């Protein structure tokens, strides 16, 4: 569960390493976001020479959360960290590589490009 002011690692090679959540998109007054949801973030840490710089305001989709998500068959999936992938307005990733596993719920949210780039889908 990602709230406003939550910090997340970035799981792609767009140049950002850590982001801070500004706003959860999808409805007025929405407080929390989970896997597959889009959030507006600002870049707090970045690598030199990357596509995005420190201080940039970007949109990102959440790919891993510590709190996890419940699936329809009753199982839960949790990860060791909160992570996101920076996306463009057309929901395509800004980076060309994805690091670490991503949840299968991204397939339901129509982020097929992220699922295809990921090394492992859990």
Swiss-Prot record:
GO terms for molecular function: large ribosomal subunit rRNA binding; structural constituent of ribosome. The keyword Manganese does not apply. It comes from the Bacteria. GO terms for cellular component: cytosolic large ribosomal subunit. It holds the Pfam family Ribosomal_L14. This is Large ribosomal subunit protein uL14. The lineage of its organism: Bacteria, Bacillati, Bacillota, Bacilli, Bacillales. Keywords: Ribonucleoprotein, Ribosomal protein, RNA-binding, rRNA-binding. Part of the 50S ribosomal subunit. Forms a cluster with proteins L3 and L19. In the 70S ribosome, L14 and L19 interact and together make contacts with the 16S rRNA in bridges B5 and B8. Binds to 23S rRNA. Forms part of two intersubunit bridges in the 70S ribosome. Belongs to the universal ribosomal protein uL14 family. One of its GO terms (biological process) is translation. CDD domains: Ribosomal_uL14. PROSITE patterns: RIBOSOMAL_L14 (PS00049).
């Amino acid at each position: 569960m990602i709230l406003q002011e939550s910090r997340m690692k970035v799981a792609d090679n767009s140049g950002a390493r850590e982001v801070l959540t500004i706003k959860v998109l999808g409805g007025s007054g929405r407080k929390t976001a989970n896997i597959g949801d889009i959030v507006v973030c600002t870049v707090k840490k970045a690598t030199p020479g990357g596509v995005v710089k420190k201080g940039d305001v970007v949109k990102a989709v959440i790919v891993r959360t510590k709190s996890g998500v419940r699936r329809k068959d009753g199982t839960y999936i949790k990860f060791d960290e909160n992570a996101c992938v920076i996306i463009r307005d057309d929901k395509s990733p800004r980076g060309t590589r994805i690091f670490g596993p991503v949840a299968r719920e991204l397939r339901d949210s129509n982020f097929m490009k992220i699922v295809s780039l990921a090394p492992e889908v859990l």
